[in-house]
Amino acid sequence: MKLTCVLIIAVLFLTAYQLATAASYAKGKQKHRALRPADKHLRLTKRCNDRGGGCSQHPHCCGGTCNKLIGVCL
């Protein structure tokens, strides 16, 4: 009988703890937030310019070659 009471109290305590933790996460108190859809989109965007695209002092050409005289990716 005592064991049953202890188990019931333990389950109630753990349930209350989970609900309290879930409430704090819902309010934005978590340490590591999941990426927003906009952040995921930024990671998936292309980071280089196609042939004919502009390039400058820091060339980011997909082909790897930048004509710095005219500022165009080759």
Swiss-Prot record:
InterPro entries: Conotoxin. Residues 1-22 form the signal peptide. The keyword Cell membrane does not apply. GO terms for cellular component: extracellular region. Its main location: secreted. It is found in: Secreted. Disulfide bonds join 48-62, 55-66, 61-73. GO terms for molecular function: ion channel inhibitor activity; toxin activity. Belongs to the conotoxin O1 superfamily. This is Conotoxin MiEr93.
